[in-house]
Regions:
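N-terminal mitochondrial targeting presequence
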Residues: 2, 9-13, 18-19
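N-terminal leader/targeting segments
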Residues: 3-4, 33
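Short, low-complexity intrinsically disordered segments enriched in A/P/G/S/L with frequent Arg
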Residues: 5, 19-27
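Pyridoxal 5′-phosphate
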Residues: 12, 26-438
Length: 438
């Protein structure tokens, strides 16, 4: 058993056909939703930079916002803004109703047992820290083991490392296979004696979709709780937290057409009831005395202070918007689009491009990290920007994974429900332009 192994595995699937100017046919990659119609819901796509249309391929970082979210938030601030859970006057009561309505919408969206299981946080990073430091401090002692994977975002690594420094817990790691999947061949051994198994549902670098139900079941069989970082999957596919087997899950509003500044922690009610509060102050108490305090009921127990009221209401609008589109439609659209992107890059660039991630679009999300002709990712992203193609360049808050795949940085293009095959074509054309420069 290797704990915290930094062994380097050099692999990727490499596109190795001759470079041509052909494009895959759209008929062979039929989309399940009409992105041209969807795009009309997003006002930013009516804008141009230097006379060129926006090609936004950074949705794994943050998504664009539809009119309904913008309008809902603006209308609330103009006509209905008031504090929640504090005042009896009509304006405040109506604001509270809208806020709690958003909570109910989120609960339904992920099939939670009830709205009490939905805790609003600043973002998913705060939610992960809340579990590590609230649940973790109450339940983990020196020598206890937390199992993570090599494909985690820093938000699911650093809090546990901080707890390791504070409490002396042990960290173990699930390695990767050569085809960018989790290596589950030794999972039973790795889970021996583990108290927590915390993992991502989908890699923000590789696009790999992990078998959440299988991993949660394995964790429970070993006597561990299962924590799932769902930031990259909730915006892109149907989510059923009850069926997943997870004990805790978290995701962020801004990646799913909602505003920044609000995230969601979902937890099984019994676990949340037993977990001590993370922050103290107003709203999270039912009584305060000179000799102590009594916590409020769920979920207020974990929502100290004035929350991001407008942002939560915006998240509710985003959830309703995505529900209207249909999350299965979003998933099928991205499978077809992923297939188109992979075929396009293969036919255009052959072995000039190396994509780090599964080749099968059924096993991945529409997030593609790649190396191109030895051009530094930061240089490449700046050249792509000249064509108004927006991509991410860097380590993507996953430095341990970068080391494992043998890259200091990659260029990442990530697609969403509003992206089209024309966006993929624009990416390929911009890469051609970069070839001419470098």
């Amino acid at each position: 058993l290797m704990v915290g192994s930094s062994s380097r595995v050099a692999w990727s699937w490499q596109l190795n056909l001759k470079r041509t100017a052909t494009r895959p046919t759209e008929a062979s990659h039929k989309m399940s939703i009409d992105s041209a119609v969807i795009r009309r819901d997003f006002p930013i796509f009516g804008s141009e930079v230097n006379g060129k249309p926006l090609v936004y391929l950074d949705s794994a970082n943050t998504s664009q916002k539809p009119n309904v979210v913008i309008d809902t938030m603006t209308k609330f601030m103009r006509e209905a803004y008031a504090p929640i859970n504090r005042s009896a006057y009509t304006l405040a009561a109506n604001a509270t109703e809208q806020y709690e309505g958003a909570r109910a919408a989120v609960a339904k969206f992920i099939n939670a047992n009830n709205a009490r299981e939905i805790v609003f946080t600043k973002n998913a990073t705060e939610a992960l820290n809340m579990i590590a430091f609230s649940w973790g401090r109450a339940n983990l002692q020196r020598g206890d083991v937390v199992l993570l994977t090599h494909m985690e975002h820093h938000a699911n690594i650093v809090p546990w490392q901080m707890l390791q420094q504070e409490r002396g817990i042990e960290l173990r790691w699930v390695p990767l296979t050569s085809d960018f999947q989790l290596d589950l061949s030794s999972l039973e051994t790795l889970l021996a004696g583990v108290k927590v198994f915390s993992f991502t549902s989908m890699s923000n670098v590789l696009g790999t979709i992990n078998p959440v139900e299988k991993l949660c079941a394995a964790a429970h069989a070993a006597g561990a709780i299962a924590i799932v970082d769902m930031c990259q999957s909730v915006p892109h596919a149907p989510t059923d937290v009850r069926a997943s087997g997870a004990d805790f899950a978290m995701f962020s509003s801004h990646k799913m057409c909602g505003p920044s500044g609000v995230g969601v922690l979902w937890g099984r009610e019994a676990l949340l009831e037993a977990m001590p509060p993370f922050l103290g102050g107003g709203n999270m108490i039912s009584e305060v005395r000179l000799d102590g305090f009594t916590c409020a009921e769920l979920p207020s127990k974990f929502e100290a202070g004035t929350p991001p009221i407008v942002e939560v209401i915006g998240l509710g609008a985003a959830v309703n918007y995505l529900t209207g589109v249909g999350m299965q439609n979003v998933r099928q659209h991205e499978i077809a689009l992923s297939n188109y992107v992979l075929d396009l890059l293969q036919s255009r660039f052959g072995d000039d491009i190396t994509i780090h991630g599964p080749r099968n679009p059924e096993l991945r999300g529409a997030t593609f990290s790649f190396a191109f002709r030895g051009i530094h990712p930061h240089d490449l992203s700046q050249v792509l920007d000249q064509s108004n193609v927006c991509v991410r360049a860097g380590h993507h808050c996953a430095k341990p994974l970068m080391k494992i795949i043998g890259a200091n940085a990659t260029t990442r293009a990530s697609f969403y429900l509003y992206n089209t095959t024309e966006d993929a074509d624009a990416l390929a054309d911009a890469l051609d332009s970069a070839s001419d420069i470098f």
